Amino acid sequence: VVVATPAGKWAPKSDVVNQANEIARKSGGKIEVLTDPKSAAKGASAIYTDVWMSMGDSEADRTEKINALSSFAVTSELMKLTTKDSIFMHCLPAHRGEEVAADVIDGEKSVVWRQAFHRRTTIQSLLYHLTRGELKGNK
């Protein structure tokens, strides 16, 4: 797993990265944190991003995030660095033009809608399991 993030306050905490690397090593994997999105995307089979803005962010917070993260936006140019059969993922909702370009999220490599559908199925299965299938009509 390769993580692309600006240095400083945006970077994951070193103890979290170390713990993740311990877990990854058990399966032959590793976690790598890079500050260059192009290096991180090169040869990737999947690109996953999330929304940058949170509800309640002040205008100053929004400006700071855009300034720090704009070079990490997923664009068609960035996707060209990935493998031929790579996919783009996003947990939604997405802000087109911020963390992802419209042509990427709506493009042929995007699996965000399939991802959202499977999330619904997963949640339904989890709820069924947690209620032991004892909801009305399922006894």
Q: Where are these predicted regions, by residue range?
A:
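Glycine-rich phosphate/diphosphate-binding loop of Rossmann-like nucleotide-binding domains
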Residues: V1-T49
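Short, small-residue-enriched loops and turns at beta-alpha junctions
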Residues: G8-A11, M55, H95
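Short amphipathic alpha-helical segments
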Residues: D15, E59-R62, V100-A102
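Short, glycine/acidic-enriched loop or turn micro-motifs at the edges of active sites
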Residues: S39, M53, P93
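Short, well-ordered coil/turn residues at beta-beta hairpins
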Residues: T49-D50, C91
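Glycine/threonine-rich flexible loop motifs
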Residues: V51-F72
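Rossmann-fold NAD(P)-binding glycine/threonine-rich loop
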Residues: L69-F117, T121-L130
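Surface-exposed, charge/polar-rich loops and edge strands
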Residues: L135
